[in-house]
From Swiss-Prot:
Record text on subunit structure and interactions: Consists of a catalytic RNA component (M1 or rnpB) and a protein subunit.
Protein name, as recorded: Ribonuclease P protein component
Record GO biological process: tRNA 5'-leader removal
Enzyme Commission numbers on file: 3.1.26.5
Region of interest (Disordered), ranges: 1-62
Pfam families linked: Ribonuclease_P
Keyword hit for Nuclease: yes
GO molecular function, one term: tRNA binding
Amino acid sequence: MDEKDLATQPEEAGQDPRLPGPHEDPRRQERAEAQAKKGPLAPDAQGKRLGQGPPKAGGRLLSLKGDRAFQRLRKGRAGRGRFVSVKWLPAPEARVGIVVSKKVGKAVVRNKVKRRLREILRRLHLPKAHILLVASPEAREAGFAELFQDVVRALRKSGLIQ
């Protein structure tokens, strides 16, 4: 690198020329606020916004473990949506099991659906219960907002949330 390539003006102290300044795009904050108002997090009947709950267990959901836990859930209360079906039983702590069969697609697609369902459940105010979510093959085509609304609908039908 030659000396002629270097800037001749000294940089102002504390400013990085690679980072945009706050003055460069005045509409940036407006667009971010407008985008935050949209989406599946609309208020419910009581005016409480779904999805605004604190994350569970430091942001992670506790998983259902073992065959027995899944077998017990067969006797639980059920609800069905377009993309998921839900079964649940009251329990001393909130635990979640997510089932995505190979009918949904290859591993990458199944993992994407599982990540979305985990994130949706993490955002909801869930009571203490063991919950089983079973994704239908149509879940692979659903966007996050559609999946969110469908999970809420199925949980309401099952009686887990109001």
